């Protein structure tokens, strides 16, 4: 890649956005940001606490502001929160300010990757995790597809392999 375009990773929880994003940024010598971690830095609290205190709407407002600021930077890799695409403004900014890579994964892989993670507020509910993930997929997958420049399935692949696939696809476009 001659010029350093921003690379924005979207997809459901458990798709590997943060892990793959760090790997990708390292391989491309770019700065890496994770929108959830940025929110935690700015609030001094974890995402679960923000959800509990401010509700999902309050969290999404913070997320939209953070993503707006980060996408104004140049030459970054950004792992977005799974629900960030619910905001039309965020979708528009991601599309306009960089290359959007949709990291796709199955519900089974999401369950396996998130089952012991207590930092997933949307899974800390009474409903069975599979039902929650299926409902989120029905709502969000069309939004990921709407803005994706590239789609890559992450099931059964290491972060390094997926990062290499992304680099190859970006270089061939």
Curated annotation (Swiss-Prot):
CDD domains: SK. Pathway: Metabolic intermediate biosynthesis; chorismate biosynthesis; chorismate from D-erythrose 4-phosphate and phosphoenolpyruvate: step 5/7. It is found in: Cytoplasm. Substrate binds at residues 36, 60, 82, 140. Binds 1 Mg(2+) ion per subunit. ATP binds at residues 14-19, 120, 157. GO terms for molecular function: ATP binding; magnesium ion binding; shikimate kinase activity. It catalyses: shikimate + ATP = 3-phosphoshikimate + ADP + H(+). GO terms for cellular component: cytosol. Mg(2+) binds at residue 18. Its cofactor is Mg(2+). Belongs to the shikimate kinase family. PANTHER family: SHIKIMATE KINASE, SHIKIMATE KINASE 1, CHLOROPLASTIC. HAMAP family: Shikimate_kinase. Monomer. This is Shikimate kinase 1.
């Amino acid at each position: 890649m001659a010029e350093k375009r921003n690379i924005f990773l979207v997809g459901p929880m458990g798709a590997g956005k943060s892990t793959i994003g760090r790997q990708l940024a390292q391989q491309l010598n770019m700065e890496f940001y994770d929108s959830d971690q940025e929110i935690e830095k700015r609030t001094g609290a974890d995402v679960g606490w923000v959800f509990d205190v401010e509700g999902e709407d309050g969290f999404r407002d913070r997320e939209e502001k953070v993503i707006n600021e980060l996408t104004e930077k140049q030459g970054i890799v950004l792992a977005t929160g799974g629900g960030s695409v619910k905001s039309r403004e965020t979708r528009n900014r991601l599309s306009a300010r960089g290359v959007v890579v949709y990291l796709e994964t199955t519900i089974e892989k999401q369950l396996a990757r998130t089952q012991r993670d207590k930092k997933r507020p949307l899974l800390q509910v009474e409903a069975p995790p599979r039902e929650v993930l299926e409902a989120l997929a029905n709502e969000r997958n069309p939004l990921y597809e709407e803005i994706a420049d590239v789609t890559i399935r992450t099931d059964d692949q290491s972060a390094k392999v997926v990062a290499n696939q992304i680099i190859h696809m970006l270089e061939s476009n």
